[in-house]
Amino acid sequence: MRTLKIFALAVSLLSMLAAPVQASRIKDIASVQGVRSNQLIGYGLVVGLPGTGEQTPFTDQTFRTMLGNFGINIPANERPKIDNVAAVAVHAELPAFAKPGQKIDVTVSSVGSADGLTGGTLMQTFLKGANGEVYAVAQGSLIVGGLGAEGNDGSRIVINTPTVGRIPNGGVVEREVRSGFGSSDYLTFNLHQSDFTTAKRMAETINNLVGDGTAQAVDATSVRVRAPRDLSQRVSYMSTLENLEVQQASASAKIIVNARTGTIVVGQNVELRPAAVAHGNMQVTIAENVNVDQPNPFADGETAITPQSIIDVNQEDARMFVFQPGTTLNDLVRAVNQIGAAPGDMIAVLEALKQAGALSGELIVI
C-alpha cells in the first residue's frame, strides 16, 4: 500500500512538471519579420442589380469609361439611365508567399447611393498595393448577407448591410510579393505583445535546442535567430523553431474601461493599497412643461404662454467600503457587488482610486 501511494505521488508530480504554466508555441505568440499579408484595393462596377443601383456622376463616368474600353461611345450630352449599376470599392488580403494563379477572397462595398448589391456581378477590377502596382484581378457574382426593401409610402426595412458583399475565391493573384525570407543570414521573430521577459525566454529556449549564440533578444519585441542559407533547410529549421513552447511572462496589471458600453476588464495582477471609498448615486430629472392661459371669450386679452420647469433630484445614501493592504481582484469585485454599484459607478470608483494612488495597475479608458 505504501509503495502504491509513493507511485501515485510520483505520477502526479511528473504530470505537474510536464504541463508548464502558460506555455505557448512560438508560432502563436510571434511572427517572422517580413512574412506578412498585404492589403489590396481597387475601384470597379457592379452590374445586374434589380433596380437598386445609383445615378451618381462618378458612376456615370466609370460606366462610360468601361463602355469606351469595348469600343462603345456615348455622346457627352446624353445620360443613360443605369439604375442597375453601382460603383464599388474592392479590397482583399494578399497572403504571404501567395503565388500567381492562386485565388483569394474579395470584399465589395458600395461607395455611392446604391440601395443594395444583392444579385449583382462585379466586373473585372484591378487590385493594387500601396506602391500602385497591380497584384490581383477580381471578378464574379456577389454573396450579400443583407436585405433591404422599401414601400411606396417611403417606409423602409433594412436587415444587416445590403451594400457590402463578398466573392469567395473571386480574386486571382497576378504577381508575387517578395518577402526576403531567404535573403539574409538571420531571421527575426516579433512578439505580438512586447515583453522583455518573454523575449528573453524565447531566446533561451531556442539556444537550449540549437546552441548558445543562435538566438538573441534584441529588445522587448524582437528575437534575432541565425538561420541556414539553404532554403530547404531553412524551411525545416523554421518549422522546428515555431513549434517550440515558451513560457510567457505574467501580464502587467491593467484595467480596461469602455466608458460608452460600461464594459470593465480587470487583469489578474491588479491590487489595491489601503483606501476607503464612499460613493453615492445622484439622479437629476428635469421636465419642461408649457402652461397656456386663454382669455375669456369676447374679452380684450391675449393668450399667454409660460414655461414651467420641474426639477427632481434623487440621491442614494453613500456607502463606504474599506480596502486593506494586499486587496486583490476578487476582493474588489466582491465589495463592489455587495453595494450594488452599476458599471458607471464602478468606473467612477476606479478613476478615483487611480487618482488617489491606491490602484496598483494601469487604468486604460477606451
UniProtKB/Swiss-Prot annotation:
Organism: Idiomarina loihiensis (strain ATCC BAA-735 / DSM 15497 / L2-TR)
Keywords: Bacterial flagellum, Periplasm, Signal
Leader peptide range in chain numbering: 1-23
Transmembrane segments: none
GO molecular function: structural molecule activity
Name of the protein this chain belongs to: Flagellar P-ring protein
InterPro entries: Flag_FlgI
Entry's localization field: Periplasm; Bacterial flagellum basal body
